[in-house]
């Protein structure tokens, strides 16, 4: 879409936009971005499913998963191809990053070389990921797996997730007449890949020497082409003394609104855009800058504009889209690769969702999150941090209660009620029974965390508006007399997304341990032990690191370290410090938390299989 078309559509939508108060629009804009992500997720899922459907129609590919030897060869070949593509993309990205600091070393430091150990871990993880992707592709391209898509959506947790996603996608359509200039926001989705592929380019120009050293240097135009809302910095490098301006030198514009770079010979100057200040460029598409050669020799000038998308907040859309598509295809993959395990998981998830306690926990979560918004915390401007912490803690507690209750009812009660004996009398192994129970609990808990998480995101986006009206919200830690912008609401909203991921990972660890306990103990004992593990998992690090306890009660330190070695340290999934400091959680931390969760869940499942293997079910 051309810039002129985008601006025209933006004006059309702006004319039809409902005239809502600015605070409401600022709240609804990040919510609309969330809805666009859901719509993109449904669209991406449909497109990928269509591609798999077309591939399955090719003779020999649709039946590839049914031929073990051929499928193994295909997996190896696809793994090599995916790894090669990953290496190519990585090398291209590294070259692009290396070129950017070369053009503007003053703007940003050069990237440090990667640690060899981190590089080994990174490429090892990439190889494993490529292998798993190849296995998934060979399995999902099966005609049998794709034929069961409709049944898979209508049963289990995919249907409520589909309903929620559809409601959010409809919200993206209604948002077109509620927010300001939505086409400009949507255009950032297209401009992001375009800017990444274009990279950072310099505009060279030679400025002739003045005919007379006493004469006023002539003004020269520098031809550029970028959008004013995408410029982040401007780097000018010259071998002679030059001066570059964003307006003609004879312009009567207020000097505070004009960028002037005086570049000495052999140096470079960098202008950094102040996001809170006025944009010095007046035209939507900047096509020219102005320069003068202040030396007595010919000057060679390199002008490098550093561009980024106008609305980086839209990066949430592809992340949500990939996450939604990933959940859908992981569900189909488990159903196709492990049919017996998936049958047990489906029955477990449907049974858990149908329980009255599941609905009760849902209602408690929905009402409590809204209540947290209006509760005065009296924190002198940090009420929103308390809302985030309270909301995440609430979702975690509800998820833990649901996981322990589900493990007790689906394993312990079925064993005591002889229902498990009936299931195992069919061609279902004990291993598939236990793993299926855990998978079903993981799906039901994931549904709860997802829906309550979206509800929390919506109200966290509203909290800055509410607190500002109550006089308790500070923008950028400085009191201002303007309402929080939608950028502020979006920033507060996305900061808790990693927290929701960690909440789910912690609930999975508790669920795995609860399943292992429920293979031998009844419901009450399972609740007591599981919540004791929950408390110790959060309390043990404090005891181990306490200097007062270390000096006065050394035995407690010993037992604390012993418990920390045997039991999972659940404090790794707690981001309360990050929320209090207002900083984002690094992606690497989430990946290591995922590895930690996978390791402890695997150990718990091995323990559950060992305890259940010789359990007398008669």
Predicted segments, located by residue:
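Aromatic- and glycine-rich beta-strand/loop motifs that create alpha-glucan
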Residues: 338-359
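Alpha-helical transmembrane segments of multi-pass membrane transporters/translocases
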Residues: 26-50, 118-143, 160-179, 312-329, ...
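Transmembrane helix segments
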Residues: 85-91, 164-185, 363-364, 368-378, ...
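Helix-loop-helix units of permease transmembrane domains in multi-pass membrane transporters
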Residues: 25, 53, 57-72, 154, ...
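Secretory targeting signals
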Residues: 21-41, 48-55, 68-83, 94-131, ...
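Short, strongly hydrophobic alpha-helical membrane anchors
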Residues: 1-29
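Cytosolic-side transmembrane helix boundary signature
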Residues: 55-63, 130-163, 335-337, 418, ...
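Beta-strand-enriched, solvent-exposed domains that form extended recognition/catalytic surfaces
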Residues: 174-316
């Amino acid at each position: 879409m051309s810039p002129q078309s985008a601006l025209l559509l933006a004006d059309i939508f702006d004319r039809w936009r409902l005239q809502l108060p600015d605070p409401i629009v600022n709240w609804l804009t990040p919510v609309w971005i969330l809805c666009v992500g859901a719509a993109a997720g449904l669209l991406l899922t449909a497109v990928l499913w269509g591609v798999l459907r077309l591939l399955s129609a090719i003779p020999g590919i649709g039946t590839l998963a049914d031929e073990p030897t051929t499928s193994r060869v295909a997996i190896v070949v696809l793994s090599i191809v995916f790894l090669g593509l990953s290496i190519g993309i990585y090398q291209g990205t590294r070259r692009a990053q290396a070129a950017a600091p070369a053009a503007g070393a003053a703007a940003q430091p050069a990237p440090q070389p990667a640690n060899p150990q981190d590089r080994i871990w990174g490429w090892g993880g990439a190889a494993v990921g490529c292998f798993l992707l190849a296995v998934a592709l060979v399995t999902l391209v099966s005609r049998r797996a794709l034929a069961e898509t409709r049944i898979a959506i209508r049963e289990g947790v995919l249907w409520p997730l589909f309903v929620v996603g559809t409601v959010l996608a409809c919200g993206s359509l209604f948002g077109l007449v509620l927010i300001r200039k939505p086409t400009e926001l949507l255009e950032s989705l297209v401009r992001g890949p375009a800017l990444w592929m274009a990279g950072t380019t310099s505009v060279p120009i030679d400025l002739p020497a003045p005919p007379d050293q006493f004469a006023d240097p002539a003004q020269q135009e520098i031809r550029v082409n970028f959008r004013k809302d995408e410029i982040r910095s401007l780097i000018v490098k010259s071998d002679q003394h030059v001066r570059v301006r964003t307006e003609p030198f004879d312009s009567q514009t207020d000097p505070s609104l004009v960028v002037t770079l005086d570049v000495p010979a052999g140096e470079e100057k960098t202008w950094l855009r102040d996001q809170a200040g006025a944009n010095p460029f007046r035209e939507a598409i900047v096509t020219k800058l102005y320069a003068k050669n202040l030396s007595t020799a010919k000057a060679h000038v390199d002008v490098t504009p550093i561009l980024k998308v106008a609305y980086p907040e839209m990066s949430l859309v592809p992340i949500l889209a990939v996450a939604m598509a990933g959940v859908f295809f992981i569900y189909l993959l488990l159903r196709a690769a492990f049919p017996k395990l998936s049958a047990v998981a489906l029955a477990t998830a449907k049974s858990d969702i149908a329980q009255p306690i599941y609905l009760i926990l849902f209602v408690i979560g929905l009402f409590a999150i809204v209540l947290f918004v209006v509760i005065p915390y009296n924190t002198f401007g940090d009420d929103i941090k308390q809302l985030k912490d309270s909301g995440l803690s609430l979702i975690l507690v509800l998820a833990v209660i649901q996981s322990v209750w589900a493990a007790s009812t689906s394993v312990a009660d079925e064993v005591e009620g002889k229902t498990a004996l009936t299931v195992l009398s069919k061609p279902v192994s004990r291993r598939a029974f236990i793993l299926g129970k855990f998978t079903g609990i993981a799906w039901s808990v994931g549904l709860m965390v997802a829906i309550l998480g979206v509800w929390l995101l919506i109200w966290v986006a509203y909290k800055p508006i509410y607190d500002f009206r109550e006089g308790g919200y500070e923008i950028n830690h400085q009191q201002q007399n303007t309402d929080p912008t939608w950028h502020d609401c979006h920033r507060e909203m996305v900061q808790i997304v990693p927290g929701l991921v960690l909440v789910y990972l912690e609930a999975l660890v508790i669920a795995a341990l609860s399943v292992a306990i429920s293979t031998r103990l009844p419901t009450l004992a399972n609740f007591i032990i599981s919540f004791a593990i929950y408390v110790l998992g959060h309390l043990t690090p404090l005891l181990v690191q306490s200097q007062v306890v270390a000096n006065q009660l050394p035995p407690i330190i010993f037992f604390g370290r012993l418990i920390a070695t045997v039991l999972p340290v659940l404090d790794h999934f707690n981001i309360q410090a990050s929320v209090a400091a207002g900083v984002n959680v690094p992606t690497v931390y989430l990946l290591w938390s995922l590895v930690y969760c996978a390791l402890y869940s695997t150990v718990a499942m091995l323990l559950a299989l060992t305890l259940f293997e010789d359990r007398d079910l008669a």
